[in-house]
Amino acid sequence: AWTLFKRGNDARRRNAIQLVYTLDIDLRNEADVLERFAGDKDVRPTPDMAYRPPVVAPEGWSGKRPVVIGAGPCGLFAGLILAQMGFRPIILDRGKVVRQRTKDTWGLWRQAKLNPDSNVQFGEGGAGTFSDGKLYCRVKDPRFLGRKVLEEFVKAGAPDDILWEAHPHIGTFRLVTMVESMRRTIEELGGEYRWETRVDDLELERLPDGNQRLRGLHLHDGSFLEADQVVMAVGHSARPTFEMLHRRGVFLEAKPFSIGVRIEHPQSWVDQARYGKCAGHPDLGAAAYSLAHHASNGRTVYSFCMCPGGRVVAATSEEGRVVTNGMSQYSRAEFNANSGLVVGIDPARDYPDGPLAGIELQRHWESLAFEVGGGNYHAPGQRVGDFLAARASTALGEVVPSYKPGVTMTDLSRCLPAFAVDAIREALPVFGRQIARYDHPDAVMTGVETRTSSPVRITRGKDFQSLNVERLFPAGEGAGYAGGILSAAIDGIKVAEAVAASIVSAR
């Protein structure tokens, strides 16, 4: 008997693409076969990928319930694992349940009305809900925690092909129903959600060694929630929370992120460039790409969060600012392909003035983008040909941008740092030699892309607790320990295990 273990493709020769299958085969004489093929890298034992929780709640446990702040992928899986272990977590989120959040998000896209607490960044499912739903990452995963994540997603309604596709994705609409299903699972296991609940402050006590210990949380309505273990899974856009943590003396440090634009091409162009005569084959689907260029000014330009057959979306969470991101549905069937085209920046060179300086840098360029776009949440846009020629765009060409509520054609150099403009101008022709028509004059760029990752790290130790605040467990992308849905979910599992271990050891 056999089952499909992994499916991908080898597209290095675009007119001779190979589909690559890895099979899991049951053999009566497995040991003999493995010995015979001992030198063959393509034949190996099937790994044991079953998840086994390292601890569970003691029978009759009735201690203080752990608290998870944030209901994105990290908080969702931290809450799920704690619930499965028997610890009945309380999950707080400043946003709303996913269906109401979706309505609020469409309010920005259709009517240019922003709800600062319910948008692409905040609410059930986190920022990953409005994305391509990519479910692969580059983090080392010796315990196969990523498999646990995928299996839970399938239980919640995801297509089972995510278990074997080499580059699985879900898409926005499916993520909506999945997070609802997982919420019900957590509640059935004794967990509790509290929506539209913002944490405004921490209650800390000073310890003899100079560090601090968390006692509880002050909430926006004036109430106090006592807690001995708190998972801080707030996401990369929780700027007021980062500012509050800094005021409270929680150890933070600035970390690198990137800034740039979204670039759009017809998906058919990308398919033809990547797959040649095989473009359109149903087993290949919409083509993706990954590009990088080290520019002469010392900067690295790279594609980020590429969304085949998707759209560019308004992703701001603060009034008077414009932010772009990309989103696809499971079908990846929309007309354009889009990707971030971003330039790496780092604290030492670009924002050396403290742990929150990266946030102020983001705000500066997002505010300029809002102004250049017309002050109405329209994004500033520019044709690639005009961008390369250093002239403002006044009209569209063959490619129509997908960003809503609208795009104002202009000069993107007005809302990007000069080093980023120079690096992207240098990179575009290079990428055009790798992906035909990538630098086509009518390709469209919209700005600005600033939320590639968290601009801060809430540094933690080997016990997953804050370096100087006991019982505070920084987690996920907002804390600087993940990037994307899968890595954030994996980190949520690891932190949940650390929380559970601390509860059991304290008894």
Task: Identify the residue ranges that each predicted region occupies.
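Residues forming the flavin
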Residues: 1-19, 23-507
